[in-house]
A protein has these predicted regions:
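Glycine-rich phosphate-binding loop of ATP-dependent small-molecule kinases
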Residues: 1-214
């Protein structure tokens, strides 16, 4: 089964992608991992991507699609894969579908882990990081033994700029702008499945397993 995971930053799609990969023994593929592997191995595609990245430029969609398609043709993907973080836009989705079709392949499911913005802002706003060792906590879900103090090294905990409500909301606005058309695209294709991401992690996963029918 070939699966694409959709969901806003902080919705938990990465966690679910890992759980799917483990249960069905298929690779969990992120574009970041693909970039790092190709650059490390000095592949032609990796070197092209590195040229853009070294200049602080976005890697063009065509090149990202080439990298993804190259990855999903590898032996460990013969029984399927979970794509996490790609595609992000309709042009990327169209290019991916076209490239897969040329190989006689297609995406089976696009699973949207749906969480309201307010929940995500609260989730991410509760994160704390240690100024000393970098350990991460959550005020509600993973609190420290002593409030505001790291369990590991005893240093102070801070709210990172990335987790501040106004920053999170900006990221969510960008996500919705880019991804709502993508959700519409996969709805028209008849492969979009939506799960409630506000419930317990294991309940989210159970809903996904039910969708996948195994």
């Amino acid at each position: 089964m070939k699966i694409i995971m959709l969901g806003a930053p902080g919705a938990g799609k990465g966690t679910q992608a890992k759980k799917i990969a483990a249960k069905y023994d298929i690779p969990h593929i992120s574009t970041g991992d693909i970039f790092r592997a190709n650059i490390k191995n000095g592949t032609e595609l990796g070197n092209k991507a590195k040229t853009y990245m070294d200049q602080g430029l976005l890697v063009p969609d065509e090149l990202v699609v080439d990298l993804v398609v190259d990855r999903v043709q590898q032996d460990d993907c013969k029984n399927g894969y979970v794509l996490d973080g790609f595609p992000r836009t309709v042009p990327q989705a169209e290019a991916l579908d076209k490239a897969l079709a040329a190989l006689g392949d297609k995406v089976d499911y696009a699973i949207d882990v749906n969480v309201p913005d307010e929940n995500i802002v609260n989730r991410m706003g509760g994160r704390r990081a240690c100024v000393g060792c970098g350990a991460t906590y959550h005020l509600v879900y993973a609190p420290t033994k002593t409030e505001g103090i790291c369990d590991v090294c005893g240093k102070e905990l801070i709210l990172r700029d990335d987790d501040k409500p106004e920053t999170v909301q900006k990221r969510l606005n960008v996500y919705h702008e880019q991804t709502q058309p993508l959700i519409d695209y996969y709805t028209k294709a008849g492969i979009l499945k939506t799960v409630d991401g506000t419930v317990d992690i294991n309940d989210v996963f159970a809903a996904i397993v039910e969708i996948l029918g195994a």
